[in-house]
A protein has these predicted regions:
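Short amphipathic recognition helices of helix-turn-helix/homeodomain-type DNA-binding modules
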Residues: 1-30, 37, 44-46, 58-109
Length: 109
């Protein structure tokens, strides 16, 4: 496993994931329109307005949007690592869960 894959394993929260997504876009040096066009060349949908909303609002992207974005940015070999990071972030933000917590924790009386 290389450094990039290890770094992606460190991502645990939606905020961490979103920060890394913004950094990925910056490293790509591509505009939202260029990213949308790159995805379209591969037969994928990557609406630039949706992508901009996700990166601006810090929300978790849908898995298919995340995969298309990662490939468009040139990190296609890490799609599975990104999707695993997204899954961890989604689980961490699920109701009744928190960092280090578990579902159903907390007393009922």
């Amino acid at each position: 496993m290389d450094e990039r894959a290890l770094a992606l394993q460190e991502l645990r929260t939606a905020a961490d994931l979103n920060t890394e997504l913004r950094e990925l876009k910056a490293r790509s040096r591509l505009t939202y329109r260029q990213l949308e066009e790159r995805a379209a060349e591969k037969g994928e949908l990557l609406p630039r307005s949706t992508l901009a909303d996700v990166l601006r609002n810090g929300s978790l992207p849908r898995p298919e949007l995340l995969a298309a974005f990662v490939r468009a940015c040139g990190e296609g070999e890490y799609v599975d690592d990104w999707l695993a990071a997204r899954k961890r972030a989604a689980e961490a933000s699920a109701p009744g869960r928190g960092p280090g917590g578990s579902a159903g924790s907390g007393g009922s009386g």
